[in-house]
Amino acid sequence: MKKLVITLSLIAVAALAFACKSGSAPAIGKVIKSGPAGNNLTVSLATSDGVLKHGNTEFTLSFTDVGGKPVDVGAVALTFHMPQMGTMQAMNDPATFTTTETPGVYRGKASIQMAGESQAKITYEGPAGRGETSFPVTVQ
């Protein structure tokens, strides 16, 4: 009887763990900004502490459908663009990405030259189609 209870308990725990993993949104950190990305998708930019810092920085870019589930969009690109101000040249700081275990969630790195207001310009092309968007972000 004791073995039966232990076996059933282990099966229940395994089933619960599988159910939680398959339907949950990805753990991406604290979202800095999100917005529509075309093709009924939402893109979210997040960092571990919710702050985008200048210099070498790491972040997560995730694409989700209307139900909040991650969607693989294929190749992604992001550039942090700060327009020309006075004698200062415009800055375009590109990011590099690696995929994660979760399709639609990408780990990014960038070297952002200066703190201030920038535009995050995002493009993608792949299984979900082609799309682009941009939104303002504050770099600290």
Regions found by a protein language model. Give the residues of each.
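Sec-dependent bacterial lipoprotein signal peptides
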Residues: M1-A19
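Intrinsically disordered, low-complexity terminal tails/loops enriched in metal-binding residues
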Residues: A19-Q140
